[in-house]
Amino acid sequence: MQLRVERKFETFSYLPPLNDQQIARQLQYALSNGYSPAIEFSFTGKAEDLVWTLWKLPLFGAQSPEEVLSEIQACKQQFPNAYIRVVAFDSIRQVQTLMFLVYKPL
C-alpha cells in the first residue's frame, strides 16, 4: 500500500487551499499595513529551500489585491508545475512580515 504524505508549508497549509477571495483578503491586509508584496516560485517546494525564485520584481507600487492576483495568475500560467507563494516585506523594519502558499501543483 502506497501512502501519500502531503507536505505542510506554513500555518495556512493546515487549512483547505485558499481561494482567490481569501488570498485577496490576506493581500489587502498586507497592503493596508504598507507592506510590499512579492511573488516567489519553486519547483521542489521543499521547506528547507531557503531561496525561491522571485517572479518579476516586488510589487512596490501595488494599490489593490487585484494587481497582485493578476501577477499570481500570470506566474501560474508560466510555471504550472511550480509551487507559488506570496511574501510581504515591511520597508520600515526591513523584515519579511507575511508568507503563504497560494498554489501547489497537482
From Swiss-Prot:
Alphabetical keyword list: Calvin cycle, Carbon dioxide fixation, Cyanelle, Photorespiration, Photosynthesis, Plastid
Which superkingdom heads the taxonomic lineage of this protein's source? Eukaryota
Where in the cell does this protein reside? Answer: Plastid, Cyanelle
Q: GO molecular function of the protein, one example?
A: ribulose-bisphosphate carboxylase activity
Return the InterPro entries for the record. Answer: RuBisCO_ssu (IPR024681), RuBisCO_ssu_dom (IPR000894), RuBisCO_ssu_sf (IPR036385)
Annotated GO biological process: reductive pentose-phosphate cycle
Where would one find the signal peptide in this protein? none
Stretches of the chain forming a coiled coil according to its record? none
Q: Which GO terms describe its cellular component?
A: chloroplast; cyanelle
Is Plastid tagged as a keyword?
yes
Q: Which Gene3D superfamilies match?
A: Ribulose bisphosphate carboxylase, small subunit (3.30.190.10)
Q: Which family does it belong to?
A: Belongs to the RuBisCO small chain family.
Misc: The basic functional RuBisCO is composed of a large chain homodimer in a 'head-to-tail' conformation. In form I RuBisCO this homodimer is arranged in a barrel-like tetramer with the small subunits forming a tetrameric 'cap' on each end of the 'barrel'.
Q: What does this protein do?
A: RuBisCO catalyzes two reactions: the carboxylation of D-ribulose 1,5-bisphosphate, the primary event in carbon dioxide fixation, as well as the oxidative fragmentation of the pentose substrate. Both reactions occur simultaneously and in competition at the same active site. Although the small subunit is not catalytic it is essential for maximal activity.
What protein does this entry describe? Ribulose bisphosphate carboxylase small subunit
Source species taxonomy? Eukaryota, Glaucocystophyceae, Cyanophoraceae, Cyanophora
